[in-house]
């Protein structure tokens, strides 16, 4: 008989994970996040980082962080609505609003908490959320917390989206369409022009999670709205400071009244200590770098195009990727994990992704090249992919 006191029921659940082959241990990174990293004691080419632009170890960001610690200390000491709102926080939000070409921005502790906080503050019981079936887990959790009804539409299927919009047209006070800007497992881009047209036709709010588009799509990485020239037509944009920006945190960009409302009702914002000064200063410096030049985003896309084309020429299935996120579709879960393990033996770290993160029989090794990778890095990785792919009869 299990006892709550000694957590036997948790032990049983862990055993179930092990039997199903989905139990995992944390990978240990023993160096800064970069194109070549030390992982579990082995120096490898890193193809699994979200550090798209190589900014996580950039000297200008490190200098800004150190100077901020000297000036502001290591922590804000309070939530921003009490006494944790430093001038540096306000400066970051002004910079982000200018960069995103939006009226205002509010920062959160992560992109995950931004989604959870914004969704539940904007919609409520009596409203409806229309959500893409492949949206991120933070969107799913935010929808659950909102108390609004949730209707799922087929992934990037505009006919299905319109079908849902017709069904809910006169039944709800507020209708909100939510989509990722770039989908993290397949690397495809949301059909935002069509989504925006449908939202305008059926009087719905548009909400875009730009976590994997910020710093990647648009002029100097301004995101999906800029990529599609949709400024002023997307109501709510979520961004992250932890991927291309290279630091930590999240934010929401939009109309000033939206930000004012979130100041009063965004629960993760209201009840979490403000971002530490070092992270804020480093994020400001990252935005400065992107605003000065598009060199990093151009290098990122050059590398992504090169790597993707070479993988395809070797015979790998890269799915429907349109971005630096390039999955190598394997199919079988065990083979995908073995592929990842053998790549590591060859000096390449590329994470195997299996069910339930992706559908059954759609297991893959997901790769992300960065602006910091050299052509030599990519060629060495491709050589390993070819060798292991042939060993496992994948190509």
From Swiss-Prot:
- What does the annotation say about its assembly with partners? Homodimer.
Q: What pathway is it annotated to?
A: Cofactor biosynthesis; biotin biosynthesis
Q: Which cofactors, if any, are listed as required?
A: pyridoxal 5'-phosphate
Write the record's keywords in alphabetical order, separated by commas: Acyltransferase, Biotin biosynthesis, Pyridoxal phosphate, Transferase
What the record says about family reads:
Belongs to the class-II pyridoxal-phosphate-dependent aminotransferase family. BioF subfamily.
Q: Which residues carry this modification: N6-(pyridoxal phosphate)lysine?
A: 243
Enumerate the catalysed reactions. Answer: 6-carboxyhexanoyl-[ACP] + L-alanine + H(+) = (8S)-8-amino-7-oxononanoate + holo-[ACP] + CO2
The record's GO molecular-function terms, alphabetically, read:
8-amino-7-oxononanoate synthase activity; glycine C-acetyltransferase activity; pyridoxal phosphate binding
Residues the record lists as binding substrate? 136, 357
Q: What class of enzyme is it?
A: transferase
Q: Which residues cross the membrane?
A: none
- Give the source species: Thermoanaerobacter sp. (strain X514)
Q: What does this protein do?
A: Catalyzes the decarboxylative condensation of pimeloyl-[acyl-carrier protein] and L-alanine to produce 8-amino-7-oxononanoate (AON), [acyl-carrier protein], and carbon dioxide.
GO terms in the biological process aspect are:
biotin biosynthetic process
Q: In its keyword annotation, does this UniProt entry include Ubl conjugation?
A: no
Residues annotated to bind pyridoxal 5'-phosphate? 111-112, 184, 212, 240
Concerning PROSITE patterns, the annotation shows: AA_TRANSFER_CLASS_2
**One Pfam family per UniProt:** Aminotran_1_2
Write the protein's name: 8-amino-7-oxononanoate synthase
Look up the EC number in the record and give it. 2.3.1.47
Keyword set includes Acyltransferase = yes
